[in-house]
Amino acid sequence: MSTQITTGKARFSYCNLFTPRAVQEGATPKYSVTLLIPKSDKATMQKIKAAMDEAKQKFMASNSGKKLPTNLKSTLHDGDGERPNGGEFGEECKGCYVITVSSNNKPVLVHADKTPLTDPQELYSGCYGRAIINFYVYDTQGNKGISAGLNGIMKLYDGEPLGGGVVTDSDWDDGWEDEDNDDLLG
């Protein structure tokens, strides 16, 4: 049994896969992505449950049989429910399980044919792919929970961008000429 799994197809949201980002001021910047896993993907959910159970067992074994902390926070949430900090998840999360995964190290990024993915424009919030993630239990500084680290991302195909969208070179080809627009107000 392993704490590492490869997901089935998921939609990516909040992609920070080329440049690490700190979630709050003073925090360590991390590479991260939120995975939107369809509730219909029973196979991935079975793998997640088994990996979470294994992470709990490993925590107890590596801590001399220490009991599992009670009231563990989880990185896995129901997209049809409420966010952990209150309020509803966005429309894109409906019908999905939502899991945010991160890493201090840059994850392996590949195309469906396993060639390296090097263009940041190709991995955006809204595209689809698979992820290799590794579950672990944490109990530090009063925070207790089960989370998952991000090891790799495989982009499968494009999807409708979430949020601000994707800008391409052709978006600038609108015929605008600078020489006649020196004074736009006057």
Language-model segment annotations:
Residues 1-98:
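OB-fold ssDNA-binding interfaces and closely related basic DNA-contact patches used
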Residues 20, 43-45, 107-109, 156-164:
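Residues in flexible loops and secondary-structure boundaries
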Residues 36-38, 102, 151:
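A structural detector for beta-sheet-dominated domains
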Residues 61-143:
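Structured, beta-strand-rich domain cores
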Residues 115-186:
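Compact mixed alphabeta submodule
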